[in-house]
Amino acid sequence: MEIKLVKGSYEYKNQIIDMLKEWIDYNENHPEANTSPNAIFRNNYEDFAYYLEHLEYKEPQEGLVPDSTFFCFDGKRNLMVGAMNIRHDLNDYLLKYGGHIGDGIRPSERRKGYATEMIRLALEECRELGLTRVLMTCDKNNIGSAKSIIRNGGILENEVLEEGSIKQRYWIVL
């Protein structure tokens, strides 16, 4: 598997939009699913210049932290297979429920090992940000996500209840 994390750009416009359309269709037909990083849906991709410009929070805003958004690109297949958002800091909400990294694999590419590798690459980015520990969370019923986190060194700290859903909180030492 040869994947890399890339920033959103016009070079990958078609692959990004193709992935977003698949995710939107999936989420409309599976309303119970929360399977994508919210950052990639902050803005409508139809105005792609605006979409790219507002993909990340570069300056702190009330209730939000600076972040970096990456897309996971499989160059052999010329396919965007996932996306992730790395929060540079944790506010109270992220410390309890969201963590440093929000990630997701496009529906047609799940259960192929991409998430484990994508998290490994994200942890390299976290090191570059100067983080020494990273918090990742997932719904307790998302076994695949938990396995990907554990494979990258995640140690379960505890479980917390968020709006009727049990979240597992894992710490990874870098």
Model-predicted segments: where are they?
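Short coil/turn motifs at secondary-structure junctions
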Residues: 89-91, 108, 141
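GNAT-family acyltransferases
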Residues: 1-100, 164-174
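Conserved acetyl-CoA-binding loop-helix of GNAT-fold acetyltransferases
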Residues: 102-105, 111-124, 128, 147-151
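Short secondary-structure boundary/hinge segments and terminal tails
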Residues: 127, 144, 166-168
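Conserved beta-strand-loop-alpha-helix junction that forms the acyl-donor binding cleft
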Residues: 136-144
